[in-house]
UniProtKB/Swiss-Prot annotation:
The keyword ATP-binding belongs to this UniProt entry's keyword annotation: no
Record flagged with keyword Cytoplasm: yes
Descriptive protein name: Epoxyqueuosine reductase
Requisite cofactors: cob(II)alamin; [4Fe-4S] cluster
Length: 379
């Protein structure tokens, strides 16, 4: 197919939509390559308030103006893949074998990989029909905002939890986009259907959701579970059983109720991986961690945040069977964050063995932050 006329582009768009559904893409939408000026205001406000986490693309102008990252852009294609929200035969956390949880966005194979494969198929489809086409695809970590593109492309609207909500799949969707030099006709942007509902804002464990689709990402549990430093004690108290990520604002959303999608085999979770026992995590080697969890999105920060979070969860459960493992962490782990968090956990759990281990550590520990964990009064 040689595309030259506007009618040809319209036909190509319909062909591409049909192909997208054929390869397992749940939603596809099209928008212009115009600047995302509304996003610029929001980003500048966030920058002024020091709300960037460091996980975002650092150049605001490149997040707003597609022409800065792609020569003569004509349109942007957005896609959405729905993912599961419920486990089949979920393992039970029980005394002596407590478990933590990975958020749903870490179930199955890393979603970045799955989305990139779908976008690559769309790229091949277009190249076969339009040899001179130019494209730039991105997922999550690219310059553009996935939610902003998808919203303007008509796939869904930005909810008060800052996530994209679709009428069909709620917010249980992964997003990706492709900038092209093809002048596809844009779709109509989605309407905001949240109305007066504030359930996600009220349910947020840390108060990170500010309403009107705004948030303080630095106190979002999803972000905090991925940090590598000591976790502030006030956030340890609300960590509950989260090893990676947080789904609270999605679970309470009315548009997500009753939704559970199993369209993609790659996204099917291994229950033992997404709800693993905690104690074995404390001593897992780097190699074993990569072998067991390396294909999951939740492994991208390495084992340290997961281990720190596992220690905090064990303390919350006051799991006395974990005391020997925690003592070993306190005495032998070379990382101050793990030693200090283990010492805090031992004081939280209590008992003679735990208390004696902390007293011994106070005689030998040199790290100031670890010593603070060993002496501060736990809540």
């Amino acid at each position: 197919m040689v595309v030259k006329q506007k009618a040809d582009y319209a036909a190509l768009k319909e062909e591409l939509i049909a192909y997208a559904y054929e390869i397992g893409i749940q939603k596809i939408g099209f928008t212009t390559a115009d600047p995302f000026l509304f996003l610029k205001e929001r980003l500048l406000e966030a920058e002024a308030l020091d709300l960037f986490t460091g996980f975002e693309h650092p150049v605001i102008e490149e997040r707003v103006y597609p022409e800065l990252i792609f020569k003569e852009p004509q349109s942007i294609i957005a896609i959405a893949l729905a993912y599961p929200s419920k486990l089949k035969e979920a393992p039970v956390s029980k005394k002596g074998a407590r478990r933590g949880v990975f958020a749903r966005a870490s179930w199955g194979i890393d979603y970045h990989t799955v989305l990139r494969e779908k976008l690559a198929l769309l790229e091949t489809f277009l190249i076969e029909r339009l040899p001179d086409v130019r494209m730039k695809s991105m997922v999550d970590t690219g310059e553009l905002s996935d939610v902003a593109v998808a919203e303007r492309a008509g796939i869904g609207w930005r909810g008060k939890n800052t996530l994209l909500i679709t009428p069909e799949y709620g917010s249980w969707v992964y997003l990706g986009e492709m900038i092209t030099n093809i002048p596809f006709e844009p779709d109509t942007p989605a309407s905001d259907l949240c109305g007066s509902c504030n359930q996600c804002v009220k349910a947020c464990p840390t108060g990170s959701l500010l309403g009107e689709g705004k948030m303080n990402p630095k106190i979002c549990l999803s972000y905090l579970t991925q940090t590598k430093d000591f976790l502030d004690e006030k956030y340890r108290e609300v960590l509950h059983n989260r090893l990676y990520g947080c789904d609270t604002c999605q679970v309470v959303c009315p548009y997500n109720r009753g939704h559970d999608f199993h369209f993609h085999e790659e996204m099917e979770p291994d229950p033992e991986l997404v709800r693993p026992e905690l104690k074995p995590l404390l001593h897992i080697s780097n190699r074993a961690f990569k072998e067991q969890f390396g294909d999951m999105a939740g492994s991208w920060r390495g084992k340290k945040p997961i281990q720190r979070n596992a220690i905090i969860i064990l303390a919350r459960y006051k799991d006395k069977t974990a005391v020997p493992d925690l003592i070993d962490c306190l005495q032998n782990d070379p990382r101050p964050v793990i030693r200090g968090t283990a010492g805090w956990a031992l004081r939280k759990i209590g008992g003679r063995d735990a208390e004696e281990a902390v007293e011994r550590a106070l005689q030998t520990e040199q790290d100031v932050q670890v010593l603070q964990e060993l002496t501060a009064i736990p809540n």
